Structure formats: structure tokens, C-alpha cells
């Protein structure tokens, strides 16, 4: 039985006649991400659309969607002000008109971050290490490991800045980190460059919090992501924590709480 082709929700009015039209990059349960053009500056931009949920009551739908898009935008604005590497907010709007028949969708236009998703960087590096088949000399291997350590410290640094600003990401994975690098078109089988600024993206689950528990859980989610997605790089995760300590003075308390979160995670794994 064939499935009907997916039809994304209609684009917001400001983007219905742009040239070129917005390009759909990803689609999730909560949002769709497009690459488009910022009309005022004619530069690339990221457009995140939170479509209306037809199964929700229209009033509740509009209220929740508006609340979530505003929360995401406020976190980004605060982080930009604090000097953390995140996309700048360019514009946003929500559709709250029309009574019970109104659309509850909302959209957020952000700075386009050029670079490689960190998940892809690590995947290419692990593929390079595997393809080398142990043929790397001691100096080459040490150089490769130093590259990974440097990137890990950069990740820890940007997460430390995030927490210092009083924001929790809520979904820290290597898919939500971008490395600003000119080495985008590297060929398969080559070792990727790991030099550049690390930028945090996708703040759909973010919120403002000063809770050490929330910060520790953020770090734990990132640690688990490395364990499940990048097993060869996982052994360097302590470098993330070193970078975190360098950029956030309150790190000692958070890292102590991280030990508790790890223990609870292990107990849940044992119980199943």
C-alpha cells in the first residue's frame, strides 16, 4: 500500500512569493525548518515554522504555539546579548486571529549559520579512523586526537556560556551544534578540519532556569548522545567538561550534580 506524498503546511504570507522559494530542510512533529532569504538584507536565513495542530482546541492551540515561539525567541535574544554563539533572531509572528476557526501557527526567522553539523564532523572523523585501519603513525594519531579534544573543549565552552546566561537547551545533541568552518566540501575518507566556532541551534525545548539539576541533565543528555552516536569520540567527553569549567564559574556545583544524575541514569538502566 503506497503512502500519499507528504504535503507541508502552507508558508506564512511573507514567504509565499519569495525568489527563490524557501527550501524545506527538516520536518519534525513540532516544527518545519526552511532555508530562505531575509527580505530586508537579501541574505540567507533559517525559517522555523510551528504549524497549527488540528487535534487541539483552537484557542489552546494558538496559546501554546505563541507561548513556545516566544520562549524560543527570548532565549535566543538573551544568549546573543550575553555573547553566546547562537543564531540571531530576525523576525517572528504568530497567527492568532479568527476566533475558533483561526490558525494557530507561528514562525521564527533566524540568522543562517554556515558550516557543518557537529554530528557530521564526528561521523566523518570516525569513518576516517576506521578506514585508516590502524595505519596511522603515533604522531598522526596524536594529531587526530588533539583535533577532537579541541572540538570537544569548544562544545563545552559554548554550553558553559549557555548555562552561565541562565538558559537550558533541553535537547543537547551533536545534531544541534554547528561548526563554523570553511572545510565543508571535504571528500569522504579524509579527516575533517575541526577548527571554528561552535554554534548552538534548535531551541525549541529551551527555557530559562538557574537550577543546577537542569544544567546537569543538559550535560547528561549530551554525554549520552556521544555514547550512542559517536562511540570513538566518547572517550574524549571529559574535554567537554574541561571546556565547560573554563567558561562557567559555577561549573563545580553543576558537575557535582552531574554525578548524581549519572547514578540515577545507571540505576534506571539496570532496572530496565
From Swiss-Prot:
A GO CC annotation recorded here is: EKC/KEOPS complex
* Broad class of the protein's primary localization: cytoplasm
Which Gene Ontology terms cover its molecular function? Answer: ATP binding; hydrolase activity; protein serine kinase activity; protein serine/threonine kinase activity
User: What catalytic activity does the UniProt entry give for this protein?
Assistant: L-seryl-[protein] + ATP = O-phospho-L-seryl-[protein] + ADP + H(+); L-threonyl-[protein] + ATP = O-phospho-L-threonyl-[protein] + ADP + H(+)
E.C. designation(s)? 3.6.-.-, 2.7.11.1
Q: SMART domains per the record?
A: S_TKc (SM00220)
Q: Which residues form a coiled coil?
A: none
Concerning PROSITE patterns, the annotation shows:
PROTEIN_KINASE_DOM (PS50011), PROTEIN_KINASE_TYR (PS00109)
**Which stretches does the entry tag as region Disordered?**
1-22
Q: What name is this protein filed under?
A: EKC/KEOPS complex subunit bud32
Gene for this chain: bud32
